[in-house]
Amino acid sequence: MSWQAYVDDHLMCDIEGHEGHRLTAAAIVGHDGSVWAQSATFPQFKPEEMNGTMTDFNEPGHLAPTGLHLGGTKYMVIQGEAGAVIRGKKGSGGITIKKTGQALVFGIYEEPVTPGQCNMVVERLGDYLLEQGL
């Protein structure tokens, strides 16, 4: 399966039990900041934004004072899982980022999608990739 198919079929799909509800944007990005696949709506990010995200995975709490920035949008960092998941909130939407051995899985949402639904979609694919050694 291509990386784009993972984004299209596993991240940008309808959320189980909620037809028509899906993430706003999604991507799979290598630890080096190279985009493996992304939705058409995924924001263009700056290298320093990706560097800050990777630093937070290695040094949990790094982004807490400044927030998580992606494509010029600032998200308030909320509880995640140190070294594994970063979660951010902005207004009625937010972001979930799951770290795998080689990549970061991004999901961005707006209402009516809930934070829990975004977490489920992103973390399920991230866990699968981890199981595959990726």
Curated annotation (Swiss-Prot):
GO terms for molecular function: actin monomer binding. Disulfide bonds join 13-118. Its main location: cytoplasm. The modification Phosphothreonine is found at residue 114. Phosphorylated by MAP kinases. InterPro entries: PFN, PFN_euk, PFN_sf, Profilin_CS. It comes from the Eukaryota. GO terms for cellular component: cell cortex; cytoskeleton. Keywords: Actin-binding, Allergen, Cytoplasm, Cytoskeleton, Disulfide bond, Phosphoprotein. A motif (Involved in PIP2 interaction) lies at residues 84-100. It is found in: Cytoplasm, Cytoskeleton. The keyword Flavoprotein does not apply. Occurs in many kinds of cells as a complex with monomeric actin in a 1:1 ratio. Belongs to the profilin family. Binds to actin and affects the structure of the cytoskeleton. At high concentrations, profilin prevents the polymerization of actin, whereas it enhances it at low concentrations. PANTHER family: PROFILIN (PTHR11604), PROFILIN-5 (PTHR11604:SF25). The variability of the residues taking part of IgE-binding epitopes might be responsible of the difference in cross-reactivity among olive pollen cultivars, and between distantly related pollen species, leading to a variable range of allergy reactions among atopic patients. This is Profilin-3. It comes from Olea europaea.
